[in-house]
Structures are given as structure tokens and as C-alpha cells.
Amino acid sequence: MKRDILTITALLIMTVANAQEERRLITMEEAVLGTGIRTESRNYRWQEEGSTYTYSDESTIYVIDAKSGKTISETAVPKEEEQKEGPKPYAYSEKGNVYYTDQDGNAQAITSYNEPGIVCGETVSRNEFGISGGIFVSPDKRRIAFYKKDESKVTLFPLLDITSRTGTLQETRYPMNGMTSEIITLGVFDTETKETVWLDVTDFTEERYLTNITWNPAGDKIYIQVLDRNQKNMNLNVYSAIDGSFIKTLFSDSDSRYIEPQYPIYFMENNPEQFIYATNVRDGYWNLYLHNTDGKLIKRVTPVDADVEYLTQNGNYIYYYSAEVSPIDRHLFRTNIKSGKTERITKESGWHTCSLSPDGKYILDRYSAHNVPNNINILSADGKKSTNIFSAPDPTAELNFIPIEQGTIKSADGKYDNYYRLIKPLDFDPSKKYPVILYVYGGPH
């Protein structure tokens, strides 16, 4: 969002006086709606097995071998009348209740609440703390965990809907500071016994947050990062998915300012008795830590003074993003969980988004930078080989404006670099003084 605002601002600061004949000024409609200045992209995706990937244009779906770069097959994109609606997901929420699809393809209700303010199977806590869904299916699909949200005592807040011709008020329940919040519980439905159990969560007060729900690989336990409403204390608890009972607290994190859990735990594929835990409380930055299922800390996986984010794992390798190269870049690294040897995978400056092929041999790397609209490369798993498969043209090439500058300014104490982007008027004269608009993002992230 911030990048979009800065880009639009730069394009609006153009003047007709210095417009080069072969370039043009952006229109107000293009600036506001983003039409005509969008970066071209392609939706490359790995196939379910091996190291082949697909992408499509308006007429054709291509399947390509990552090793050779050769096209394996081409099929026509189905016509609109041939495109059928896909099947219902295995478990889903509809009108505030949870359903699953049985072996015969029929929808079966798990919950049947109709009280105002009771919602099941949907995201809770305003999508904070890494919460992005409300249904969690066990690895073997036998059990379905789901949030139940009771917001019946939460204050109704009016919002103006400007999409209607005259404008209408729509009410939503919003837990204001210091006022009653929603009450969250977690149910577990067994598709074999057709019974639901509720996890016995008793930490803190009932206005606690249940965050980052994680199944163990066997599908009989659930791990929850339970956070108090003051957001200063978090317990990583494990519960029985069979009867809902509390088993134990593995460990707790606390901070006098606030705690903000963001990620689930990640069980080791080659050792289900160990998992990766991410936190920024212990060493000042988001880092990864290896624990066993008794809660004991085995090692700090990423001992760097920078924020990192877990991506995936393959054998003994943990792949993760890191800001250690530059706080305005995101690079992919991997570390050997046994030896501790770490390798930087991506080399080009920019913001990288990567995915590992199912066979673990290749990486699909999408990245953009200050002067790179959108590049897509195929990398070897160790990053030593790189093949470019797509480079987007510059969407501003025909537009008349001065390129945005980047740089750093030292903090007042001289210890830290503050990064900036500088947007100058098209007729900028370095001998003159100009008023400056300084925009600072004041949020917590």
C-alpha cells in the first residue's frame, strides 16, 4: 500500500513544461485507479509432484520442465461456458456455521447455531496475531477444529456504506479499547464418532486470544499460543484433540510492552518430536528456535540481528526469509539444522517471494526492487544456478517524470540508518530550495 501511494505521488508531480516529446503525462484517472501503470506479471505455479511448473496466458496453459526449460505440454484454456464451479472444500463455514463434505460428497453440518452474535468457523480477533482462518483440519482429515466466536456482548459500531446510491449505515461488532471483547473457544469435531469436544482453555481471562492453531503430525493433539488480552503474556499450550483436555504448557513468553505472536509452530518433517518456533521476544528480532515437544529449547536456528520468517523445510534444511542484508530487502536463506551452516540463496537486491518445488530441487523466485518492476527466476535449491523466465517491462517507461531516489539519513545519535525515498518535481533545480512533505508510517510494524 505504501509503495502504491509513493508511486502515484511521483507520477502526479509531473509538469507539462518539461514533458519530452516521446513521453507523456499520466492522467488523473490512471493515477487514482492504477490503470495503465500496472506491472505485468505471470502466475507461475509448481505442479503437485516433481519439478514442473505451469502458467497460462489468455488462450493456453503451459507446463514447463524446470531443469531443461522446455515446454512439456500446451492445452487450451477452457471457454467460460466450459468452466465449472469446483467442489465444496472439505470443511467450510457458511452463514456462521461449520460444515464438512462426507465421502459421498454431501454437506454435513457440524454446528447449527442461530443466536445473534454466535459465529463458527470464521476468522477471529480482527485477523490479528497471525489469525487468517477459522477452520483447521487434522493431517489425516479425521478431525476438524474450528473457532466459535461469541460477540453477543460486543458493542455495535455503525459504518457508512457509500456503495449504495444514497449511502446506508451498516452495523458491525467492534471490541473497543476497555470495553467487552469477543469470547473465543475452539471445538474439535470427529468425523468418525460425529462428536464435538471443546478444548479446556483456562489461561488468563475469558477474553483471551487463541492464536496460531497447529495440529501435531499424528492429528491427536492441538497446540495453541494463548495470549492474554493485555498482550503481555503468552503460553504455548498443548491439548488433547480426542477429549479436549489440557495436557501442559510447553513454555511462556512475556514482555512489559506487548507480545504479538504471528506464526504457528512448524513440526520437523524428519523428526515429529521437534518443532520450529518463531518469536521476537527473546533476542529483539524475529528469529527461529528449535524446541522438542516437551518444550525444551534445543538451539537458536537463526542467530542473526535481523527479522526472519520461516518459509519451508526440505530434509535437514530450513528455508527462511531474512532482512539481514538490508531492512528494505527480503532475501531467502537456508540453514542446515544439524551443522548450522547457512547459505544465502537469492542474490539480486529486492523483495523476494519464493516457493520450493515439491521434489526440493528448484526454487521459483519472484522479486521486485526500486528499479525492477517484476522478475521471476528459477533457482537451484542452493541458489548457485539461476535462470530468468520472466522480466516485466517498465510500466513507467513512456511516462514523463523524474525517477524516485533512495538513500539513508543517520539518526540523531548517529547509530542508525533511516531509509527514505525522495520524490522531486520534474523541473527540479538543485540551486533552489523547495518545501518538503515528510511522510512517516507511524504504525507498529
Q: What are the functions of these language-model segments?
A:
Residues 10-19:
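Hydrophobic h-region of N-terminal signal peptides that target proteins for export
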Residues 21-39, 194-201, 404:
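A short helix->beta-strand "capping" segment at the edge of beta-propeller domains
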Residues 38-54, 79-92, 117-143, 171-178, ...:
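Conserved beta-propeller blade repeats
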Residues 55-78:
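Beta-propeller domains
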Residues 59-64, 95-99, 153-159, 183-185, ...:
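Structural motif
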Residues 66-69, 102-105, 190-194, 241-243, ...:
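Short loop/turn segments that connect beta-strands within beta-propeller blades
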Residues 69-71, 110-135, 146-199, 384-394:
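Predominantly five- to eight-bladed beta-propeller fold
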Residues 156, 219, 353-445:
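Serine-hydrolase catalytic core recognition
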